[in-house]
Amino acid sequence: MSEFDPNPPRRNFYGRRHGKTLRQSQKGYLSEDLGSLRPRGITVQENPERKPVAPSTIFGDDRPVWLEVGFGGGEHMVHMAARYPEIGIIGCEPFINGVAMLLGKIRAAGVENVSVHPGDARDLMDVLPDASIDKAFLNYPDPWPKARHHRRRFVTPEHLIPLARVMKPGAEFRVATDIPDYVRQTLEEVPQAGFDLVAEGPQAWEDWPSTRYEQKALREGRVPHYVTFRRRS
């Protein structure tokens, strides 16, 4: 098992880890850039005792820290990092093609306030201290459309309870999706995990960049939906 294997045997993971063959440039990003951007002590192999990993050890100071779960191709994460250079942003993504795409965007944009965990967000949340995250994002997550797979969605207690634990009281949690049933489940499950609904509807946030997933939804006639929660005090 390699040092970067994000699939610990203690936990099920659903979904793809690899897609189409990576370009040589993307392979270069992974071999040259990921090592310096990857937070240490997240995987079970590196941290079997699951000792806490403070965000200040990741970014080297006590700046506010945001978390993006499943950053896809990285458009949103890099946009936010460039717009808010005083913030540290940790992104989690187990799909290696998405990680490679993000690394290319990071290199092109020259942003330095990012950290990339190429694995399951649950492994990161396992070791983050209580109330250590100032804002979190879940943008166009895997919809798992079949009813028997709905419990694999991120908006379930298995994911939301750990997320609530690591978020500061009053911290904002944003969800973007174009799947009506995902909106339904989000509105049902997230408040039960300790969040209050702030806003929901088709109007995007002021600092939202249009992503390739959003553009695909619009081309195919689906209406994007944006939901904002706040961590209950």
Swiss-Prot record:
Keywords for this protein: Methyltransferase, S-adenosyl-L-methionine, Transferase, tRNA processing
GO MF entries: tRNA (guanine(46)-N7)-methyltransferase activity
Record's GO cellular component terms: tRNA methyltransferase complex
Translocase in keyword set: no
UniProt xrefs under InterPro entries: SAM-dependent_MTases_sf, tRNA_(Gua-N-7)_MeTrfase_Trmb, tRNA_methyltr_TrmB_bact
UniProt pathway annotation: tRNA modification; N(7)-methylguanine-tRNA biosynthesis
Pfam families: Methyltransf_4
Superkingdom of this protein's organism: Bacteria
Binding site for S-adenosyl-L-methionine: E68, E93, D120, D142
CDD domains the record matches: AdoMet_MTases (cd02440)
Reactions catalysed, as given in the entry: guanosine(46) in tRNA + S-adenosyl-L-methionine = N(7)-methylguanosine(46) in tRNA + S-adenosyl-L-homocysteine
Region (Disordered): 1-36
Residues the record lists as binding substrate: K146, D178, T211, R212, Y213, E214
Active site per UniProt: D142
Enzyme Commission identifier(s): 2.1.1.33
Keyword Transferase: yes
General function of this protein: Catalyzes the formation of N(7)-methylguanine at position 46 (m7G46) in tRNA.
PANTHER family with a match to the protein in the record: 3-DEOXY-D-MANNO-OCTULOSONIC-ACID TRANSFERASE/TRNA GUANINE-N 7 - -METHYLTRANSFERASE, PENTACOTRIPEPTIDE-REPEAT REGION OF PRORP DOMAIN-CONTAINING PROTEIN
Family as reported in the entry's similarity comment: Belongs to the class I-like SAM-binding methyltransferase superfamily. TrmB family.
Name of the molecule in the record: tRNA (guanine-N(7)-)-methyltransferase
Organism, as annotated: Paracoccus denitrificans (strain Pd 1222)
Lineage: Bacteria, Pseudomonadati, Pseudomonadota, Alphaproteobacteria, Rhodobacterales
